């Protein structure tokens, strides 16, 4: 690939980056909460469905954010945006590495 083509490919990727204000790192998980006693639904084996955003930090510390049902779609999109941003940044870095090679 020629240097001009590499630069154009990099610029195309840069224009496709999602809005950084609409990203979140983590995993969206569905969990079932069961109360130990006093809840007929839990005693029947059903439990309560909840959605959480799980984020693992440096050092192995994990944090979970409980989500309201109306937040699920937004958080799912933000997680996808983060994954897309990460993929695009890696691709841009690879193209920039190629631009650092001596011209042939």
Predicted regions and their residues:
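A positively charged, amphipathic N-terminal helix/segment that binds anionic biomolecules
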Residues: 1-104
């Amino acid at each position: 690939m020629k240097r001009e083509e590499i630069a154009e490919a990099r610029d195309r990727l840069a224009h496709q980056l999602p809005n950084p204000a609409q990203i979140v790192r983590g995993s969206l998980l569905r969990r079932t909460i069961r109360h130990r006693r006093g809840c007929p639904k839990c005693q029947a084996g059903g439990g309560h469905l909840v959605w959480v955003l799980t984020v693992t930090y440096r050092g192995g510390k994990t944090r979970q954010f409980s989500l309201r049902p109306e937040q699920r779609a937004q958080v799912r999109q933000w997680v996808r945006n983060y994954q897309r941003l990460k993929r695009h940044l890696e691709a841009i870095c690879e193209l920039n590495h190629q631009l650092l090679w001596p011209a042939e």
